[in-house]
Each structure stands twice: as structure tokens, then as C-alpha cells.
Amino acid sequence: MDKQKVTALTQKHRSLFRFLFRLHNRFPFVNRRKGRIRTQAGLSYLKGCRITGGAGNTLIIGDYARLKNCVFHIEGTGNTVQIGPWCYCENAEFWIEDSGCTISLGAHTALCGNIQLAAMEGTNITVGEDCLFSSAVRLRTGDSHSLLKKSTGERINPSASIAIGNHVWVGTNVTILKGVRVADGCVVGAGSLLTKAYSQPNCVLAGVPAREVKLDVDWTPERIPVREIL
């Protein structure tokens, strides 16, 4: 059944489907909860997920999102994790260590296994719509520990937010560090380390540290046959 038919059917009987999804998601043998995080799940499907953290935090999951074996660990207060509609997340970990942080995924974004998103010290991780993350990807807005200038004791490694644009494909084993910006339509090569803002849209980023290696690209999850070169 395609997305339009699913949407039409569930919206016609929204109250019933909302009750059924909510009942399923709350079964303790399906998902585990600990703490007082406010959760809004709508018409979403969760299985094998673990949600822990303190009061004053919010988890919002959009309609038709599917989450399998995900971990939400939200400490502090005033934090929000928002998963957009039609997202797919499997074996993903969402970690917030302090207060005033946000992690958000745009609609139709997919996290495909062993992925960690960690925000701290009031920073944000923002991922746009229609993005695709391969396995073993790490996004961190900070270092979790303090790096100091020896002579003064001043801390020199502040945390900084991460922003990923729309329609970005991130390959396997990629690390995205604090302060990174990635423009719309980009592709990040496997094993790359992103350390800065990349403002050029529709390019391939690759390397350690990553740099622009190809311009004027686009991508699709479909496997299109390559035309034979005569």
C-alpha cells in the first residue's frame, strides 16, 4: 500500500488508529520507559525502543514514523527530540547530556543502523527532510570534556550546533563534529570526517578532513541502470 492510501485510510479513522498505535507503543514488552519524559507519538510505530530521562523534556514523533531498537537518553531539562513524519530509524541513539538542547529530523529521513546523535550544552542537531544516513554515523555537538589553555585555565573547546540540509546522503562510518553545516543535496563519502561548514550545495564531500571533491551532483535511493558508454 502506497503512502497516499495509508494516509487516506488512517486519517479517515484517525481516532481508532491513534488508539491502536498508542496501545501498542505503551506495552512494556514492546518498548521500555524510565523517567518522566513527555512523549507525543501520534500515528507512529515503535518497537524495541528505550526512553529514559528526566521531567521537563519532550519527545515528539510524527505520524507514520517507524522506530526500531532506538535509544532516547535525555538528561537535564527543557530538551526536545523531534522525529518528523514518515521517518525511519533503526538502532539509532539520541543522547542529550545537558539542558536546552534540540535534536530534530525532517520528514522522510532515514537512519539505517548504529547511528548516534549527541547534543550538549544548549546546542542543536538539525537534520533536514529526505536525508539518508548509512550505518556507523556519529554526530556530536561537543567533546563532553573540557580542553583548557594551560597558561590561563580558560576553556577553549566550546560546543556548537550541527545543521544538515535537505536531501543529504551520508555514507557509512562518517563522523560529523561540532559546528558542521552541510548544504542541501550533498553526498558525504564513506569514512569521512566533517569538521566545518560546507556551503556548496549538490556536491560530494569526502576525506579526512572532508573537502569538496565533485560538484553538480544529485542522488536518488533508486538504483538507476547506468547507460553503456559507446
Feature map (PLM): residue ranges:
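Domain-scale signature associated with acetyltransferase and cell-envelope carbohydrate enzymes
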Residues: 1-141, 158-161, 165-167, 174, ...
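Regulatory activation segment
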Residues: 151-157
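Beta-rich strand-turn-strand
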Residues: 174-186, 192-195
